[in-house]
Every structure is written in C-alpha cells, then in structure tokens.
A protein has these predicted regions:
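Extracytoplasmic loops and strand-loop junctions of Gram-negative outer membrane beta-barrel proteins
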Residues: 61-64, 142-146
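Outer-membrane beta-barrel translocator/channel fold
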Residues: 56-62, 128-139
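Charged (often Lys/Glu-rich) extended helix/loop segments that serve as interaction or gating elements
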Residues: 51
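Glycine-rich phosphate-binding "P-loop"
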Residues: 69-71, 145-152
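Extended lipid/amphipathic-ligand handling interfaces
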Residues: 2-11, 17-20, 27-44, 68, ...
Length: 199
C-alpha cells in the first residue's frame, strides 16, 4: 500500500508524508520528482528524484524485481537522502545495516545501474563494516565477479575512506581495520572483469 500527501504539476510530483508498505518491506519519508514533460521519454536519465528516506526496512527479494543482483532473504534497514535520476543518483548521509551485520555510513554515487553501459559506484565511507562472505550474501553476482576470494582471509573489515568500483576497475584509498591488522591503502586494480588476471 502507498499513502502520501500527493501533488502534481507540469514540472513536479510531490509525495509528502510518504508511507509504502509491501508484504516484506516498509518505508517512510518524502519524495519529489522534478522534470520537464519531455523528460519522461528518457525517464531513467532525465527525471530527477529528491527522496528522503526517514526509516525503512527493504526486502532484498523485493528489490530483485527491479535489480536482480541482491542475495535472497536479506533485509536492509536504511535512512538516507537520494538525489538525481535513476541512472545517475547519489545517496547522502546513508545509514544502512542488514541481516548479515554489514554496516554502511557515508555517501555513494551510482551510475548506469539500469543501463547497458558499464556501471560505476563511487563511495566515501565514514564506516563500512563487513566481510567478504557477508558481501557475497548482499550482492553475490557482482562481488564474486569483482573481488578476489583471497580477501576472505581478512575476516571482518571496517573501512574509512574512498572506494570506486566499476565493471573494469577498483580504486581504493582508505584506512582498513581487519582481523589480521590495520592498513592504510591506496590501490588501483584494472581488468577486474577478469578478476584472476587483474593488475
């Protein structure tokens, strides 16, 4: 079910006091869609979203209906602000946890998630806590292809800093705390679409 104080004009849709409930998810916040009428022809790239998620729990199974990359049976607990069109949006002040005890706080930009072009994710983390095995549960198709399995040896990892990931490269500039110790790293991997041959 969806309820909101709804307003519509030729340039904006407003959904204030927004509440969305599905069988496995719930979300509270506000949403604005800003556009020119011609923008609907290229909805993914032109219609700009301005969304505040005050609190939500979102089923990965339900997200897979839109973006079939998430692991099954997970639930994300999230509060954030989202700005931009669906194919080039940013989360600001993201606070996200899940059933596998991963925790993300920071700002993340997503490009081309709904496109045939190479995707790119650029993140500035105040905190990213997870393990390789937890990440596989969250994004199994992406993580298994993009990150080498040797990272699993690090165990639980807490990261502060910048990470940029695309179809073909991984750039990391961060401070990481792991089960094996602490490391300040600046790393660039290319050719990660063939992760075992990455350099």
């Amino acid at each position: 079910s969806l309820s909101a104080d709804f307003a519509y004009s030729l340039t904006k849709i407003s959904l204030e006091k927004l509440s969305i409930k599905t069988p496995k998810s719930a979300l509270e916040g506000t949403a604005y869609l800003n556009y020119k009428r011609v923008d609907f022809k290229d909805f993914l790239n032109k219609v700009k979203f301005d969304v505040a998620i005050d609190k939500a729990h979102i089923s990965a199974n339900e997200l897979n209906l839109f973006y079939n990359e998430f692991g099954a049976e997970n639930v994300f607990y999230v509060a954030t602000k989202i700005e931009g069109p669906l194919n080039n949006f940013k989360t600001k002040n993201l606070n996200l946890t899940d059933n596998f005890n991963s925790n993300i706080k920071g700002n993340i930009a997503f490009k081309n998630l709904f496109s045939t072009e190479d995707y790119e994710i650029a993140a500035n983390f105040d905190e990213l806590s997870s393990s390789y095995n937890q990440l596989i549960e969250i994004l199994p198709k992406i993580i298994k292809k993009q990150l080498p399995s040797t990272i699993a040896r690090l165990g639980e990892v807490s990261v502060i800093g910048d990470i940029k990931l695309s179809t073909t490269f991984l750039n990391v500039n961060c401070l990481a705390f792991t089960n094996l110790g602490e490391v300040q790293t600046s790393l660039e991997l290319k050719n990660i679409q063939n992760i075992d041959q990455a350099s």
